[in-house]
């Protein structure tokens, strides 16, 4: 059917139920191959490592300052490329990634080993759910 793709986004119309599903099939698989990221051995269910909640505490603690080793320019550039690629995907069809991408993007200019680990966890998450999309 004509008009079922736009800017790399696949649009599947369900007129009978008045719904529309947008997705980007194959985008995540291509991204994982491009950045040579292996499939996770067990599913990653969250896009970002969160601080544990202290139930009953008067206040929640903020994360401690990242004092891990700084990355070289090549590894920092790789993080920037991954964040850019996933930002396009997240804004188009998978907005659950935006909070994690925002946190990583804020630290990518002075990327550390901890930032690289956060990107690795995010790639594990998208590898767990490669065919995600939005239904309107």
Predicted regions and their residues:
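Long, low-complexity, charge-biased intrinsically disordered regions
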Residues: 1-136
